[in-house]
Amino acid sequence: AGSGFLSLCAHGRLSGLALEAGAAVSHVTAVRDGRALRGAGRRLPLAGEHLCRHLQRLLRERPAEPPAPPALGKKALTQLKEQYCYVSLDYEAELREEGCQPPARFQTPDGRWLTLGKERFCCPEPLFRPQLLQHSCPGLHQLAGQSLQALPEHLRRHLLGNIVLSGGSSMFPGFPERMCLELNSLFQGAGVQVEVLASPKRGTAAWTGGSMAASLTSFRHSWMTKDEYQEHGAHYVHVKF
């Protein structure tokens, strides 16, 4: 089954809007009664790996601080991103004020210390402003809006109250609140309160949902067997689901 549907399963839902921000790519998937609505799917070619590289650039380009050392590899950057970065609720205002959170200090593998200021909230901002990484596509919240606008009004209203976050790049502090603010702004005249569901374990929600779904006897008709895979190939998964 699609990872968007499985993320919904982890929250006990068969219908909803799944917003997945992972390592290599981010997705928006509208699901109704366990089926992904293909015309409403959206893709953002930007996720955690891009944010790590963005953080590296931010650290190297600081004029008033020593640049990040070459020893700051992918593992250290990922640790730095996950432990100290957050999503701002008002990016422009916080950028003017150099951040509302205190600076953080991080020791690199070679023993040097780095101080992080505005890099803490500038790192994940491209999820909402892809143009910061020279991408012309809309932000994840705007793609969610496009997906919802592609649906009939009654279904759109239902899904606005069932928005589920998943993936490691949705784990930034402030990410759920920012997403809720942005979507409420996009749909302020809809007369529906946007509800964004963010489990503390949402980083592995798709895996959890897959485990739950596979344990249900009612889901067995959707399994792709080894014989089917050998007969039809990997593309058959799109026929089954």
What does each model-found stretch correspond to?
Residues 1-241:
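C-terminal region/appendage detector
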